[in-house]
Amino acid sequence: MKIFSYLPHNEISRNAAVCKKWRQIAYDTRLWNSVSLRPEVSGLHVYSIEHLMSLISVRFAASLRYIELPMELITHPVLHELANKCPNLTHILLDFSTAMQLHDFNDMQAFPTKLRTMCICLSEVIFMEGFMRKIYNFINGLEVLHLIGTYEKADEEEEEIYEVINVHKLKSATPNLKVVNLYGINFVDDSHIEAFSSNCIQLECLAVNFCAKVTGSSLKILLSRCKKLKCLLMNQCSLQNDQVMAAEWEKSAIQELDITATDLSAESILDLLTRIPSIRWLSAGQLDAFTDSVLKMWGENANLKNLVALDLEMCDNLSEEALYKFIGRFGHNLKGIVLSGIPTVTDSLIANVMPVLKNLRILKMGMPLDCSNRMQSKVHVDQLTDTVANYGKYMERLELSWDNDTLRFSDKSQKGIDTLRVRCPNLKCLVLCDGKYYEIVKANFERADRVTVVRTSKNSTTSNVYLLSHYIELIFN
């Protein structure tokens, strides 16, 4: 049973055909408490509604706590069966993203009532109201809501935008929400944020990443109404400087903030960051206005005693000297720092600041391949790995994504890699650019039976999101 618990469900299903003993184990309901029926995710797909209803009754039953359903399986008989046979179901994902037409929900009379988390992947063209109005009475206990838009699937061509779900009605049915994630939804604007703030006074975390219509005009109302709001993520929103400066940040409980790629001015960034009472997590990447003077003034005028995570990716107007002074002063508390995309960040800076960063768990450095010509010097990776090994005993995630023309290593690199592997036993992920050095490091870790640690920057990346207080609740898909 314990061995089977480590296998994906598609392998468990295949193993059921080996013998009667394995079939008995494979059908044990304890192995099916978390199920994805989206074939592109899990490899599992049920081809008939009748078969799924049989599985819910016999295989899943009271053990089921989490389920993902694709569009073709979201029907009222299936949802009725989940409500009746799965009393412990607390997490559900409903994927409408590929839908061209909804099923008929006129006869739907039941829906799981103990849900704590619900994720809905929206379609670009299917209006959800026919389905949503049938479930409003069953979801008032929701604490975590994900509405996932079509940002990653959108074409570059301008298309007509439809408001496919009525957020204003939805917020009235979910007064107990603590975490709301509106990801990449092309119709979401400040009126929708204001709607959630009017009814969800328990809100602790709001993420509107990649919602380009959000300008910040709702920030003042949001911060005044939601006194428990600690985490606000606005990556690539179209924030306006005057709207951001008008919000009363000094009276808020905000501790975690993402303003990546929001094109704020230096004045607005400084005004915002110095008024937050106590910040612990900041992502301010891709901001041309985040300069040496902003970094210096922020350090002198803000309360940074609790700062544990800082992301300055692609803030290429920062100098090595300014970063050295800032990290030297505040680095002792940092658990995660992202400095990739900054040409002045090389092994020499890390060698100077790493003795201060003794609590560091996440470190990201490097340069995107299409920007590698901006590097002002070569990076001696042997010295870098030796420095990290000596001072980063708590290191969990490390990314050194410089290309092979920028990295310099020697025949003695194996010794430095050995030292890094032995002295950083908690290292879960080491991301490198594909090439000769990557092959050397990967082979070294594989010989030590740590085959999943070393990864290429084509398939993996590192960030500070693991340090968010609501990281687990914010995971979707």
Per-segment meaning from a language model:
Residues 1-477:
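The conserved beta-strand core of Leucine-Rich Repeat
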